[in-house]
C-alpha cells in the first residue's frame, strides 16, 4: 500500500456508512465508531408523501446511504430466538444454516424460527403543510421530533406459528411431527392431501393464542399490534410505497433504493372451500433455503390429487407469507362500534407482557374514529391515523386498492358492541389485503379455519407513547 499524505486525502460525504477509528482504553480494543456518534448528527432516513396526492409512492428523505443499507444495519432477516430472547443469526443465503456455519435446527430444539432485527432504533411519523413523513433513526432519537423507541424484536419467519400440542405452546417451528400438527389438530387428515402436518395452527380464539404464546416466557405475544405496525412501516420506508401488494421490482431506482412491493400475495388452491375447508394449504418450510430473500416465492402442493404450483408468495428479507393468506386477530387492538355505524380503535400503550382487557375499553388509549358505513363492507380511506404505533383509517373515504394506503378496512356497520381487529387479510381478500388491512367485523372470541397467529417477542418492555427529543 502506497503512503498518502493527509493533505492529499479527498473529503468524504458523512453518511450512515462513515466511520472513524477509535480506541477503548478500558477494554484495550480498537474499533470503528460511526461519525454520527461523535458529531451528534444521527443518521436517519425515510419517505414523504404529498398531501392530497393519491399515489401510494413516496419520495426519499434523509441519509440516502442509510436508505440503501437500512435492512443490513437493522439486521433484518432470519434468527433462532430462545425463550430467553437470545438470538442467533441464520445464514442470509439459506435458513437451514447458521450465519456462523453449521446446520440450523428449526424444529424447536434450538429456539424459535423468527424474523426480525437485532438493533434497537427510533421511528418518527409527522407532517407539515405539504407532506406526511415516516422516518427511522439509528443510534438515538431525532432531536426536534416525537420519537417512538423500537427495541430488538422478532416475529414468525414463516409468516405464522405452530402449536406445540403436547405443551400448549405457540411456537415458530418447522416440524412435521404430530406434536406440532397445524389447523385444528385434526389427526384424521394425516397422510391425506390436506394433511395439517407442518402447517400453521388455526381456528383458535386470540385469547387462546396469546395464552399459548406466553408459555414461552415473558415478552412473548401473539399477533401483537406494534410488531405488525413496525413491519408495515419498514416496508413503506424501504420500498417507498404504501402499496405492499405492488408488483415486485428487483431493479433499484436512480438513488439506489428499493421500489415496488412484494406482489399481490399467495395463490389459492383449486377448491380451498370445498376440499380444504379453508384450512392452511402451504407448509411452514416454504422458502427456507432462500434465506433473507426479498421477492416472490412459489411451491408445489398436492391439491386433492393434482400437483399444483402455488405462486406469488411474498418474502421480505426472509419474512414469508405475512399477508393475504391467513387472518390474524390482534391481541391488543379493540374496536368499539358506534351508533353512526363507525368504529373507534382502542389500544394499550404498555408492551410489557400483560394481557390487554378485550372486554372493555376502560383505561385504554383511543387511537381514532373510522369512517361511517351505510352497510357492511370494505372501505378505503384517504388517510390513516398513525398514532402510538397503531394504525386505523380516518373518517374520509375516497381511497381505493391502488391509491393512498391501498389496503381495505371492513366495517360491519354495527351500532354497538366490541369487535376484534383481524389483520393481514386472507387468501380470498385479493387486493384488499396488505400491511394495514383490517377486518373489524368479528367478535374477539371468534375463531375460524383461516385465522392463524404469528408469534412475536421483544428483548425488553417498552411504551408506545412517543417521547419528545429536545434539539441541541
Annotated model-derived regions:
Residues 1-17, 26, 470-472:
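Short, intrinsically disordered N-terminal pre-domain segments
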Residues 17-24, 318-320:
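Short hydrophobic/aromatic-rich beta-strand motifs
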Residues 22-40:
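Short, surface-exposed terminal/edge motifs of secreted or surface/virion proteins that either
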Residues 24-28, 52, 121-123, 160-162, ...:
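Acidic glycine-/aspartate-rich tracts in secreted/extracellular proteins
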Residues 40-117, 124-125:
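GGW-centered surface loops in extracellular recognition modules
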Residues 108-112, 138-322:
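Short aromatic-cysteine micro-motif
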Residues 251-285, 306, 326-334, 361-472:
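C-terminal, surface-exposed recognition/capping segments
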Residues 310-337, 349:
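Extracytoplasmic, non-cytosolic globular domains
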Amino acid at each position: 500500500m502506497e503512503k498518502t499524505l493527509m493533505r492529499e486525502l479527498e473529503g468524504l460525504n458523512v453518511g450512515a456508512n462513515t466511520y472513524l477509528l477509535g480506541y477503548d482504553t478500558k477494554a484495550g480494543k480498537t474499533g470503528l465508531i460511526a461519525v454520527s456518534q461523535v458529531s451528534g448528527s444521527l443518521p436517519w432516513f425515510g419517505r414523504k408523501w404529498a398531501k392530497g396526492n393519491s399515489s401510494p409512492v413516496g419520495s426519499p428523505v434523509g441519509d440516502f446511504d442509510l436508505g440503501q443499507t437500512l435492512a443490513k444495519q437493522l439486521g433484518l432477516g432470519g434468527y433462532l430466538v430462545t425463550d430467553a430472547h437470545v438470538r442467533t443469526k441464520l445464514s442470509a443465503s439459506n435458513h437451514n444454516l447458521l450465519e456462523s456455519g453449521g446446520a440450523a435446527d428449526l424444529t424447536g430444539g434450538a429456539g424459535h424460527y423468527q424474523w426480525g432485527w437485532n438493533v434497537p432504533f427510533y421511528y418518527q411519523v409527522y407532517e407539515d403543510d405539504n407532506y406526511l413523513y415516516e422516518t427511522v433513526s439509528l443510534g438515538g432519537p431525532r432531536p426536534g421530533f416525537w420519537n417512538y423507541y423500537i427495541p430488538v424484536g422478532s416475529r414468525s419467519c414463516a409468516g405464522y406459528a405452530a402449536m406445540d400440542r403436547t405443551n400448549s405452546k405457540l411456537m415458530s417451528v418447522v416440524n412435521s411431527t404430530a406434536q406440532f400438527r397445524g389447523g385444528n389438530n385434526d389427526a384424521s387428515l394425516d397422510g391425506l392431501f390436506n394433511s395439517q402436518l407442518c402447517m400453521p395452527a388455526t381456528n383458535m380464539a386470540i385469547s387462546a393464542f396469546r395464552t399459548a404464546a406466553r408459555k414461552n416466557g415473558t415478552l412473548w405475544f401473539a399477533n401483537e399490534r406494534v410488531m405488525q405496525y413496525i413491519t408495515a412501516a419498514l416496508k413503506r420506508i424501504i420500498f417507498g410505497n404504501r402499496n405492499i401488494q405492488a408488483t415486485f421490482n428487483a431493479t433499484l431506482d436512480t438513488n439506489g433504493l428499493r421500489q415496488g412491493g412484494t406482489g399481490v400475495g399467495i395463490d389459492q388452491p383449486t377448491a380451498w372451500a370445498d376440499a380444504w375447508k379453508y384450512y392452511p394449504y402451504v407448509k411452514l418450510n416454504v422458502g427456507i433455503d432462500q434465506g433473507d430473500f426479498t421477492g416472490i416465492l412459489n411451491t408445489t402442493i398436492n391439491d386433492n390429487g393434482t400437483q399444483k404450483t402455488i405462486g406469488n408468495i411474498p418474502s421480505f428479507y426472509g419474512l414469508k407469507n405475512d399477508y393475504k393468506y391467513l387472518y390474524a386477530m390482534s391481541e391488543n387492538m379493540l374496536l368499539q362500534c358506534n351508533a353512526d355505524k363507525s368504529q373507534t380503535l382502542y389500544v394499550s400503550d404498555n408492551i410489557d407482557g400483560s394481557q390487554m382487557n378485550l372486554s372493555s375499553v376502560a383505561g385504554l388509549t383511543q387511537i381514532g374514529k373510522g369512517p361511517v358505513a351505510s352497510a357492511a363492507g370494505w372501505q378505503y380511506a384517504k388517510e390513516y391515523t398513525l398514532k402510538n404505533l397503531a394504525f386505523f383509517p380516518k373518517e374520509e373515504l375516497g381511497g381505493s386498492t391502488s391509491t393512498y394506503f391501498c389496503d381495505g378496512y371492513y366495517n360491519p356497520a354495527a351500532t354497538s358492541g366490541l369487535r376484534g381487529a383481524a389483520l393481514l387479510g386472507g387468501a380470498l381478500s385479493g387486493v384488499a389485503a396488505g400491511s394495514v388491512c383490517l377486518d373489524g367485523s368479528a367478535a374477539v372470541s371468534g375463531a375460524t379455519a383461516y385465522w392463524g397467529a404469528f408469534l412475536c417477542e421483544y428483548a425488553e418492555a417498552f411504551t408506545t407513547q412517543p417521547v419528545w427529543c429536545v434539539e441541541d
